[in-house]
């Protein structure tokens, strides 16, 4: 064996350096005189170091009382610690869906086209966690079966970074957890990145040297007391709300793929603004037809576009004996000056067609209207053909931005918007129902108004907010968006009428196409072709993408994935369930290859009345009180049929406004107000009873008594919860 290293080993005395001889430190030059109070001179002891003991003194002055009291509570006999661990996409942003709310569109079913949205307002409750468990998106480490008590201890969330797309996140644990008109605008990256306590999730491209995830620890919500609650009470308590949006941290002030930050769009011209109604009666039908005949169809200058040939020529060639040259203006531009413009040179305000072209739209409208009626006879047909696709008042003949010459006027107006000049003061955004004839803002008729915010923030998540606020899931087809903005060129502002709004539309709608540029227009929509929110979303999307730090939809799909770990404790006094198997017919000593499954139960049905407890079991039998209680609550165990909800459960609620009194309607169901005395409320309701037949008055009184009964029962339940110690703050409810 080779023992040569023994001689080369480093002995302790050889390699240890020699201790430096102690010398007094050299005197330093005195520095300049200090203007503030001199520090206390520190006297250093020479020689061996000795520990110093200071005298005990009270810290912080005199003794004060505790800021928090420790309230003790009896623990249940059986406690299990449970972690709910799962994965989910917090945001799935398809192409050009940056301004949409993914929480609202997470359950959409689309055959083609972009999916999702670029922002989200996602809430988490115990019911939502169980819903995710049923979708096989999480697992529970311990079952909650027969354990009717629960404690929430917090959660941990991991955000996984995207390779190329950045995100901004803000977590809220303080109620109220409701959407208002400024919630979605505050989530725009330009607004959210200026707020406090935001979390940046940079892409791997933006910050390549860091971890591929961002971990966040979130505690229990504010106003939440840490104690044992029934699971049925904690089922709908909002635990936290996450606001998140995609952003661009590399190019925050415009995409490098464009040379202009301004947004161009069109608004309806002057002939439309007093005649915007779509549901017309017999008298209104005649008025509208005469108005548009004189102010739209008789204007030859509106036909100077290639869309005239595309919409009118095919039917003319197929149904009439006239050729297309019969409608073309043959006069050429000459050097002889005249008082009228009669030539066909559109570069100098000439007209490409003669007066006979104004008769064609009426023929084309009636032909296609009749063809559509024969194609879908079961559909409800409109009362007029003014909204026909090919030659109606919103046809591409009048609204397409491509004219024969770029200065040729149309039935629209071009608007330029610069997001960096928009101060927000004076801006108004609202929606009007399609049954409204004008675009003037009205506090009673107009809905979902947003005031004094930049357009790039006001349009962010606006369509989803309108849908939740009005309760109309088809809001995009039943309303139109109006806007007033003095920061455009020209200004969208009428100084004579400050409440006047303007209706904009997308480039594809003006060209007679669907959103996204598809030429395949459904036959029902060709029957009712008019401006609505569905055809305005592209302009709203473009304006939102022009704002600071906005995501520019460079990817077909961008996903922000998260992993969550909710910390719970289940407790209760269940009956001991002992399973005895036959010892001879059992399995072998080796374990089962199938992983052990944990059966989670809907927290809604894990309540005091629906669970057997140890005190219900006496001498091997169930007691009479327990059997009677379970028989009374047997209706709650009936499973309802599976149906698709109208809105995803994870989406936040909208703050409800006080309902207006309507003397013609029946008694309105309103929320329970505990601060109002029942006698006072009954007196107010009796005063609202209108005069009428005795039978109607008795029916209204019966409805009032039923409503009063429900309110008294809810008050009694709340008082009982307070006495039991199970009461929760009202703002913590997901419906609050």
From Swiss-Prot:
InterPro entries: TTvirus_Unk (IPR004219). Residues 650-664 have a biased composition (Basic and acidic residues). Residues 633-692 are annotated as: Disordered. It comes from the Viruses. Keywords: Capsid protein, T=1 icosahedral capsid protein, Virion. Belongs to the anelloviridae capsid protein family. Self assemble to form an icosahedral capsid. This is Capsid protein.
